[in-house]
């Protein structure tokens, strides 16, 4: 057997998805076409890999950190010419996937302890988006993170991450995934999300994007305080209320009450003073 005697390792955050219906929903959400090259992060024992290879996708390019799993994956898919495997840390590799056939989509059950850095690697930041963007990312993440990504202004889970991701991609929930669908089961609820990165002409201009990042760091460092206080250092106090009004905001609003596009308007209004 390819993976005989291998058990999930806590230090790698390994929780292998075993539910066939969830695996199928993940692949269906990716809407794979014959010209798609798929990047899979953390294939584990290959349950999702097998479903991806059963799709029309042109290739599946997987990245696995656990060297003990690499040999098993190579053995399991030895007869599949569309399968390629990189051994290494997805956060450290200089290039993801085949250099000649850049992945067009990402499908992955990612280790929850690297969700933030991995999202930055795959989608980018407002001031440094990944170029060219992937067409779609279908990711299995901790439900708390999924809710933060899709949260709207005024909701308790709305955060700087919500603003960043909503300005970089169309985000939607695919399905919740309970712990029983994994081996071993995690102690948290999970969710499949789909992200469609926005083209450059639908994202904030680079100069404004940098200002949005700056304002998010200031405001969400004290998310319960009014922006009149948290943004006081961003511009002269005498002009701050005028700039807030220009962006359609009031000094009494708190960061979690300001929608993603309002942060863009605020950054554009404050830009000359930053």
UniProtKB/Swiss-Prot annotation:
Its main location: cytoplasm. It is an enzyme of class 2 (transferase). It is found in: Cytoplasm. SMART domains: rADc. GO terms for cellular component: cytosol. Keywords: Cytoplasm, Methyltransferase, RNA-binding, rRNA processing, S-adenosyl-L-methionine, Transferase. It catalyses: adenosine(1518)/adenosine(1519) in 16S rRNA + 4 S-adenosyl-L-methionine = N(6)-dimethyladenosine(1518)/N(6)-dimethyladenosine(1519) in 16S rRNA + 4 S-adenosyl-L-homocysteine + 4 H(+). S-adenosyl-L-methionine binds at residues 15, 17, 42, 64, 89, 109. The keyword Transmembrane does not apply. SUPFAM superfamilies: S-adenosyl-L-methionine-dependent methyltransferases (SSF53335). It comes from the Bacteria. Disulfide bonds: none annotated. InterPro entries: KsgA/Erm (IPR001737), rRNA_Ade_diMease-like_C (IPR023165), rRNA_Ade_Mease_Trfase_CS (IPR020596), rRNA_Ade_methylase_Trfase_N (IPR020598), rRNA_adenine_dimethylase (IPR011530), SAM-dependent_MTases_sf (IPR029063). Its EC number is 2.1.1.182. It holds the Pfam family RrnaAD. GO terms for molecular function: 16S rRNA (adenine(1518)-N(6)/adenine(1519)-N(6))-dimethyltransferase activity; RNA binding. The keyword Methyltransferase applies. Belongs to the class I-like SAM-binding methyltransferase superfamily. rRNA adenine N(6)-methyltransferase family. RsmA subfamily. Specifically dimethylates two adjacent adenosines (A1518 and A1519) in the loop of a conserved hairpin near the 3'-end of 16S rRNA in the 30S particle. May play a critical role in biogenesis of 30S subunits. HAMAP family: 16SrRNA_methyltr_A. This is Ribosomal RNA small subunit methyltransferase A. The lineage of its organism: Bacteria, Bacillati, Cyanobacteriota, Cyanophyceae, Synechococcales. The gene is rsmA.
